[in-house]
Curated annotation (Swiss-Prot):
Protein name: Crossover junction endodeoxyribonuclease RuvC
Membership in a protein family: Belongs to the RuvC family.
Record Pfam families: RuvC
Stretches assigned to coiled coil: none
Compartment(s): Cytoplasm
GO biological process, one term: DNA repair
Gene Ontology terms, MF aspect: crossover junction DNA endonuclease activity; DNA binding; magnesium ion binding
UniProt catalytic activity: Endonucleolytic cleavage at a junction such as a reciprocal single-stranded crossover between two homologous DNA duplexes (Holliday junction)
Complex formation: Homodimer which binds Holliday junction (HJ) DNA. The HJ becomes 2-fold symmetrical on binding to RuvC with unstacked arms; it has a different conformation from HJ DNA in complex with RuvA. In the full resolvosome a probable DNA-RuvA(4)-RuvB(12)-RuvC(2) complex forms which resolves the HJ.
Organism: Klebsiella pneumoniae subsp. pneumoniae (strain ATCC 700721 / MGH 78578)
Residues the record lists as binding Mg(2+) 1: D8, D139
Role played: The RuvA-RuvB-RuvC complex processes Holliday junction (HJ) DNA during genetic recombination and DNA repair. Endonuclease that resolves HJ intermediates. Cleaves cruciform DNA by making single-stranded nicks across the HJ at symmetrical positions within the homologous arms, yielding a 5'-phosphate and a 3'-hydroxyl group; requires a central core of homology in the junction. The consensus cleavage sequence is 5'-(A/T)TT(C/G)-3'. Cleavage occurs on the 3'-side of the TT dinucleotide at the point of strand exchange.
Gene: ruvC
Length: 173
């Protein structure tokens, strides 16, 4: 069993999603958004750090998965996003959580099957995979999709490692 916290970082809205993985089964534990309504960036970053720390304390995750920075057309936006990611990662590492990063295209490919999927498609698939009664809000859905991606990637890595080990032992040909 593992609990995974997914984070969709943003300087104004940071989505989070928490799921439990038992074997191949995924179950929803919680999701939402950390909203920063103040104008100055240092105060927003402090709120993101405090919010992520509170979520970690509440859910006690085993793994922390976060979206990688993409190259935005606006350099200022990319820098702010990078800073928001940074404080979220520091909150995780301060709690000794292993941090995993996934590109947005990889998340969409894993959850929807198309790397260029629309937000509504991600929301629908997250709802379906986690058997939710309604679509989660967009930022929370993205965070849940990041957590789901971590489950799939780590599960595939474990299967590959097991296959390599069996090959080395001469059990597979």
């Amino acid at each position: 069993m593992a609990i995974i916290l997914g984070i969709d970082p943003g300087s104004r809205v940071t989505g989070y999603g928490v799921i439990r993985q038992v074997g191949r089964q995924l179950s929803y534990l919680g999701s939402g958004c950390i909203r920063t309504k103040v104008d100055d960036l240092p105060s927003r970053l402090k709120l993101i750090y405090a919010g992520v720390t509170e979520i970690i304390t509440q859910f006690q995750p085993d793994y922390f998965a976060i979206e990688q920075v993409f190259m935005a057309k606006n350099a200022d936006s990319a820098l702010k996003l990078g800073q928001a990611r940074g404080v979220a990662i520091v909150a995780a590492t301060n709690q000794a959580l292993p941090v995993f990063e996934y590109a947005a295209r990889q998340v969409k490919q894993t959850v929807v099957g198309i790397g260029s999927a629309e937000k509504s498609q991600v929301q629908h698939m997250v709802r379906t995979l986690l058997k939710l009664p309604a679509n989660p809000q967009a930022d929370a859905a993205d965070a849940l999709a990041i957590a789901i991606t971590h489950c799939h990637v780590s599960q595939n890595a474990a299967q590959i490692s097991e296959t390599r080990l069996n090959l080395a032992r001469g059990r597979l040909r």
